Every structure is written in C-alpha cells, then in structure tokens.
Amino acid sequence: PEIRFEGFTDAWEQRKLGDVLERRIEQRQQSEEYPRLAFASGQGVIPLSERKTNNREQLTKDEYTKKYLVTELNDIVYNPANVKYGAIDRNKCGRGLISPIYVTFTTNEIPGFIERIVTSHDFQQRALRFEEGTVTKRQSVNPEDLVTLDILVAPKREEQQKIATYFDNIDHLITLHQRKCEE
C-alpha cells in the first residue's frame, strides 16, 4: 500500500481468501443461548426483531425444530445469491442462528481487517466473475469459488488492527453526521 501507519514496513502478503477463512458448518435449533438472527444487505447480521418483515416467518415450518446455521461474533457472513448487492459482512451482533442459505466463516486474522477486504467494491466485483446459474437474477457465488480469490494481507496483526480501528472510527463519524443531518 502507498499509505502506511508509522512503524510498519513489511510487504503485504498475497494469499487466498481461504487461507484466512474457515467455513463454519455447525447447525443448531433455536434456544435462549442461540437466538435467531437475520442477515440483510447494508445492515449485516441483526436481531431478527429488527429485520423489516415481509412475512417470511410463515414460510418456516416447525420453527423450533428446524436447524439453523450457527454464527458467532466476528464471523464473516455472506449470501451466495446476493454478492452483487453487497450481502457480505462481519457479524457485529453476536452469537446466534441464521438461515442455512447463508455461508459463515471464522477467521484467524483480525476480523475487522478481513471485513474491510470482503466488503470492498473491488473484492465484490472480483467475486462476481464466479456467479453461476441459468437465470440471471438467480445466479450465485459458491463458497468454494469465493475462497480462491487472492487478497493482500498485512503480515502483522497490529497493523491489521490499526487499519480496522481507523475505518471503524470513520464509519462512526459518518453515522454521527448522518444523525445530525436528520435532526
């Protein structure tokens, strides 16, 4: 990168996304320890109660016996059918269960740093070259393809954390200014 934080000079490493992510495949039934969550483009992982409803719950049979996908705080979650709409984000909500139509990954790097990579326009555009499906509106990006994408990774976790914190602070400032404008 052209701009670096002071004290970091090591070259970034080109790696496959699959080198820094591991798919989480555990499923469970809904419980107090594992509440239902939702995943929405532009919002990320949110409590199910905050999702704008379109009566999807009536489509779910046996709500309390159905198994859902486990997600934990800082997992990377994406919707294979909606990458084109930015449906990839970090779980900032916490432990819970989401629909098994989504894909969840854990990471061995700083989650906020990996979030910035996978939510970037450039990354999402590169992911779209893997879209498959016979109907354009129903195309999806398989997780097996997504993890083959090359990414650049800061070799030191301290630098990753500084980058993640920097962008989190910018996001926070934007949110504050948006609220101020709405008043």
Regions found by a protein language model. Name each.
Residues 60-124, 131, 137, 142:
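A short beta-sheet element
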